[in-house]
A protein has these predicted regions:
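Conserved N-terminal glycine-rich FAD pyrophosphate-binding loop of Rossmann-like flavoproteins
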Residues: 46-70
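Conserved redox-cofactor binding core of oxidoreductases
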Residues: 99-219, 240-241
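N-terminal Rossmann-like FAD-binding beta1-loop-alpha1 element of flavoenzymes
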Residues: 17-41
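An anion/pyrophosphate-binding glycine-rich loop and adjacent beta-alpha core
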Residues: 275, 279, 285-396
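Glycine-rich loop(s) and the adjacent beta-strand/alpha-helix scaffold that form part
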Residues: 216-219, 224-299
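Extreme N-terminal leader/targeting segments of oxidoreductases
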Residues: 1-17
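N-terminal leader/propeptide and maturation segments of large enzyme subunits in energy/redox metabolism
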Residues: 79-105, 110-122, 354-396
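Conserved Rossmann-like nucleotide-cofactor binding loop
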Residues: 25, 48, 317
C-alpha cells in the first residue's frame, strides 16, 4: 500500500462531514448529511460523479407492492441464503439491515427524480422521451412461466430492478439528481481533487483530510471534519500492485479487469479511478484491512450469456453442471486449459430458452419476431429474438 505522503496544506476549510468519492455511495452520503443540516464537502478526483450499470435488489416496500412482489419471499430466507453463499464470512446483521430497510432507501433515492418512469413489467413499452429521461423496471417480471425459484439449487429471488436510459452511464440520471439535491442543500463539491492523507487528533479520532487540487497547481487543501470523514472511494482493481497482493489470481490469470482498463471511470489526469485510495488512507492511519478479498469476476457468457447450455473445454470434455450462477461459472472456467470454455447449443435453442432459469446474465424469454422493435426498452440480457439469422448465434 506504500507509504503515507508527507504533505502540508496551504489552505484550510472547515466542514462537519467530508466525503471522499462521488460515486453512488458518496453521492447518497452527501445528500443524506446535507439534508440533515450538516456542512458537507464531497471530494472526487474525476471531473464529475462516477456511476454505471443500474441493477438493485430489495425486498418488500412500495415498489415491490406496486409490482405484486411484496412478501413474495421471506426476508430471513434470502438472508440465510446469502450467508451460505458467503460461507459465513460476512455479518448477518448487515444483511438483515439491508433486507429490512433497503426499500426505504430506494424510495428516498428515487424521490430526487420526479421525472422517473416506473414500468410495471420488464419490457413495458415506453417512448423514446421516457427512455432518454430514465426508467425503472422490475427484472424478470412477470416471472417466466416455467420458472420457480423455490425449486432451484441456486435460486434467483424475484427482487431485482434496474434503472435504464439512453445515457452511457445508464443510471447516471438518478445519481445526478441525488447529487443536485445534495448541492441544493449546501454540499460543496471538490471535483478534480485527490484524497492524499487522513488527519487524526491525539486520541486517534479522524479529524479531516488533506486533498490535492489537480486543477489548481496541485495545491494541497486541508478539509477539517468536525463530525467525521466518510471513505467512499470505490475499489482497488485498477492498481496492479495492490491486486497482486490481495487478489493475485486476477493478475496471474490475466482476468479481464474493468477497473484496470478504466471502464469504471477516469480521473482528471486520465487514469482509472479504482486505485484503492481509501484503502491506503485508512491503512496508513492504522485501520484494519478486511480479510478475504472477493473479486467480483462473474462470467457473463457469450451470445447466450450464462444460460445453462452445454459447456466444454479445449479438450472437448464437459467439466461442470452448467446450471449455476455467473461467479461459480467463472470459477470453473478458470480451472480449464487456457481458462477457455465453449458453449454449445443446437437449432432447438428457441424452444429451450423459455425453460431456462431467470438468473443474472441468462436468457429465459423469447421475443416474437413480429413484436414491435420501436420500444427503446427492448434490450435486456434475459431476452433473445427468434429470427431467420438464428444460426449465426450457434456454437459461440
Amino acid at each position: 500500500l506504500g507509504e503515507e505522503p508527507d504533505v502540508q496544506a496551504s489552505e484550510t476549510q472547515d466542514f462537519d462531514v467530508v466525503i471522499i468519492g462521488a460515486g453512488l455511495s458518496g453521492v447518497c452520503a452527501a445528500r443524506a448529511a446535507a439534508e440533515e443540516g450538516a456542512k458537507v464537502a464531497i471530494v472526487e478526483k474525476s471531473s464529475s460523479f462516477n456511476c454505471r450499470s443500474g441493477e438493485y435488489a430489495l425486498l418488500n416496500g412500495s415498489l415491490n407492492k406496486r409490482w405484486g412482489r411484496e412478501n413474495i419471499v421471506d426476508e430471513d430466507v434470502v438472508v440465510d441464503r446469502l450467508m451460505r453463499e458467503c460461507t459465513y464470512r460476512n455479518k448477518r446483521s448487515i444483511l438483515k439491515k439491508w433486507a429490512s430497510h433497503a426499500h426505504e432507501v430506494m424510495d428516498w433515492f428515487i424521490e430526487a427524480y420526479p421525472e422517473l418512469t416506473i414500468c410495471d413489467s420488464t419490457r413495458e413499452a415506453v417512448t423514446q422521451e421516457q427512455f432518454d429521461k430514465g426508467i425503472l423496471v422490475p427484472l424478470a417480471w412477470p416471472q417466466p412461466e416455467h420458472y420457480d425459484y423455490r425449486n432451484e439449487e441456486f435460486p434467483t429471488f424475484p427482487s431485482s430492478m434496474e434503472f435504464r436510459s439512453s445515457r452511457k452511464d445508464q443510471q447516471g440520471f438518478i445519481v445526478e439528481a441525488n447529487l443536485n439535491k445534495a448541492v441544493e442543500n449546501g454540499a460543496q463539491t471538490f471535483f478534480g481533487c485527490f484524497g492524499t492523507k487522513l488527519l487524526k487528533d491525539s486520541d486517534g479520532r479522524v479529524t479531516g483530510v488533506i486533498i490535492r487540487d489537480a486543477q489548481n497547481d496541485n495545491k494541497y487543501i486541508q478539509l477539517n471534519a468536525s463530525k467525521g470523514v466518510i471513505l467512499a472511494t470505490g475499489d482497488n482493481s485498477g492498481d496492479e500492485k495492490i491486486m497482486k497482493h490481495f487478489a493475485p489470481e486476477i493478475v496471474e490469470k490475466k482476468i479481464a479487469n474493468m477497473g484496470a482498463m478504466g471502464m469504471l471511470g477516469v480521473d482528471v489526469e486520465g487514469k482509472t479511478v479504482e486505485t484503492g485510495d481509501g484503502l491506503r488512507m485508512g491503512a496508513w492511519i492504522g485501520a484494519k484491512v478486511q480479510d478475504f478479498h472477493a473479486p467480483m469476476t462473474h462470467h457473463m457468457g457469450s451470445g447466450m450469456g450464462v444460460t445453462p447450455f452445454l459447456q466444454i473445454n479445449k479438450r472437448g470434455d464437459r467439466f461442470m453442471n452448467e446450471c449455476i450462477p455467473g461467479q461459480q461459472l467463472e470459477n470453473q472456467i478458470e480451472l480449464q486449459p487456457e481458462c477457455t470454455s465453449f458453449q454449445l447449443y443446437d437449432s432447438k435453442w428457441g424452444e429451450e430458452v423459455p425453460y431456462m432459469p431467470a438468473n443474472h446474465g441468462g436468457l429465459c424469454y423469447i421475443i416474437p419476431e413480429d413484436e414491435d422493435e420501436s420500444n427503446p426498452n427492448y434490450t435486456d440480457r434475459q431476452y433473445t429474438k427468434i429470427s431467420a439469422k438464428a444460426e449465426a448465434y450457434q456454437f459461440k
